[in-house]
């Protein structure tokens, strides 16, 4: 059991593994990003534990973000994954690969392209609340 949180990655020519092998099931990496820090989230799985425990994540948690929402989102997903949030820059299609999760064995795998590396040093409260949810998640054996 346990939780593995994998933060953003990008495809490169020196990768040892294909980008489809970053998780227990296949997904592709893209260079997709959402750069408008005010982009409104759409919650795709409102009842998912990662959006509710220990903190109920709402639109308010995405206020005050700096520079961008995220980058290197997932593209094609194996059906085992649940995409949790979608965003889009103005005039663009929504991207739902910024935060995905799946149960695997007795644990949970999470991939996120959310720009925590910018939000946490900037002291954005909602980023801390969401990250706390990611690292404190539990699964049922």
Predicted regions and their residues:
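Active-site Gly/Thr loop motif
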Residues: 68-77
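A short acidic/glycine-rich loop-to-helix N-cap element
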Residues: 117-127
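Short, solvent-exposed loop/turn segments at secondary-structure junctions
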Residues: 11-13, 89-90, 107-109, 115-118
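Short, surface-exposed beta-strand/loop micro-motifs that present aromatic residues
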Residues: 94-105
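A glycine-rich, often tryptophan-bearing local segment used as a flexible ligand/cofactor-contacting loop or short
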Residues: 2-64, 124, 130, 136
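Hydrophobic/aromatic beta-strand patches that form the interior of the parallel beta-sheet core
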Residues: 5, 84, 110-112
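Short, hydrophobic/aromatic-rich segments at coil-to-beta transitions
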Residues: 77-86, 98
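Loop/turn elements at helix/coil->beta-strand transitions in domains of secreted/extracellular proteins
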Residues: 1-3, 107-108
